[in-house]
Amino acid sequence: MSVQLEVETKTSAATVTEEIPVLDLGPFFAGEDGAAEKLAAELRYAQEEIGFYFVTNHGVPMDLIRRGYGELERVFALPDEEKLKLRATGTRPGYVPPNSVVYVTSPVNKNTKADLNEVLRYVNERPDDHPGRIAGRRFHGPNPWPENLPGFKETIKECHHALAALGRRILPLYALALDKPADFFDPFFDDPLWTT
């Protein structure tokens, strides 16, 4: 299964059509025979040939996804002075205003233009006594939460946990896609980091 995506370029009147793979997680989650191997092959193709994919039957409630997007809309609708109270600083995650960062991702093509996007980066917060927090490591928190948006923190944390659980559930597929045992990555995910 795939989704047709039409992209119109500014440099020509041509329309490019690419197929974005859609991976159905349902049979894998149901434990159907051969589902893991089939899905791992589809995942490998998607990652090697396309670079990204959609998933269906992932188990994350659509209501939660909608609520998460709704909360993000609320925070981005705040006045700039309120958003700047959440600003990422040093190792602290948080709000990154537009035109404040230049991303250089290639030694060949050195980008000098500021990124136009505004971003809200949050991480899975660690307890105060976590070694990463004590050492002041990046991506260990704490997150700066808006004070004037009731329910924001709870909804975003609920989204984080649901998506992290999904990532953990599909981790064996990545191992199988690389011709490794399904539990190959398990030792590396005893204290995982994530950022959104």
Give, region by region, the residue ranges found by the protein language model.
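Peripheral, non-catalytic segments flanking oxidoreductase cores
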Residues: M1-T196
